[in-house]
Amino acid sequence: MARNVSSWSSLSCLPDEMVLNCLARVPRRYYENISCVSVRLRSLVRTPELYRMRSLLHKDSIYVCFCDRENYSTDATYLWFTLRPTTATMEYQLVPLSFPSHNFMFRASTVAVDSEIYFVGGRPNPTELWILDTRSGKLRQGPIKPEFLRIASSSAVGVFDGKIHVIQDLKQDETEEQVYDLETQTWKVVGVPVPDEKADSRPNMVSSVSLEGKVYAKDFGSISVYNLRQGTRKEKLELPIDDRWVSCMCVANNVLFAFFTKYGLLWLDTKLNNVWRVVTGDVQTLHRKLYGSAMAEYYGKLAIFWRERYISTSINTTKNNNNNNKKKEEKIWSALIALNRVGDGICGTIEWSGVVATIPYICQFLHCLVASD
């Protein structure tokens, strides 16, 4: 402890630019702990300049996975891409990657830690852990995890304090949690939950994100919050009463953002007792276009992806040709949204928007994660 204090004392003597240069090379998962050391470090970790430095170093990458929505068998196709800026113009594109394709990717809960993507549980083998190294494209199997009392299609998953937390609901106010220690590479069951006779009726989590020691898990019509600092205490997050459908959500600049069907892009004001507030600006022109969407943080901005279906190539040109004889493809669009604090609110400005890929029409968004070196 004394050595840590001494190290910070030496670092505190350096100018902001040099400290930021050091922080830009530190894995993002340590930023939350670093921000607790001092007010100055907390401010530096959240400054836009840090994101600019990380972008110059190409430290962070978005990985998007599409799957065949008409075939969930062992023969399903999984297409992986990464978002990259073009060299000739100030535009972006999704570049195809030769990552492995496995059936567990569809049902598994996913989370990115540094440069690796973890696939936890799912079907057909809910006790498996698979790890994809985004730098090499290699896939390896991790330690077998304990079985949950209830087998679900997916679980809430988040990273906190050097550990991956995997959570499932049991009774109304009771959860079951398993923790994977990233350093020791071992699993631990937290608590001894009591089986729930109505467990089969509990919802499956569609996606989840982590923010300040809490895991926010989205299913079809609600968002649950699991407080990891308080023994995985569960609470329901209130949603707008007339707009409960969340198409996608993510954390950017230590704020939870979600796209709602009616109100568009909202952010969660945790200082005002978890009140949803509208993100102002021209970003609100997008939400009517979001057909099958995904969202992730990209160097302090929001990167939003959505599908736009169109018919591109005719198989034959006979007089009786119809839509069934046409090959369908879909354009994948993306927009980069700059986020700025305006008083007590947040303004979202579209910095760039365009087509980033064309994929087979049978594919849908499956995963959208940010990995970093």
Curated annotation (Swiss-Prot):
Coiled coil: none annotated. This is Putative F-box/kelch-repeat protein At2g41360. Kelch repeats lie at residues 116-162, 163-208. The lineage of its organism: Eukaryota, Viridiplantae, Streptophyta, Embryophyta, Tracheophyta. Residues 8-54 form the F-box domain. InterPro entries: F-box-like_dom_sf, F-box/kelch-repeat_ARATH, F-box_dom, Kelch-typ_b-propeller. PANTHER family: F-BOX DOMAIN-CONTAINING PROTEIN, F-BOX/KELCH-REPEAT PROTEIN SKIP4. Keywords: Kelch repeat, Repeat.
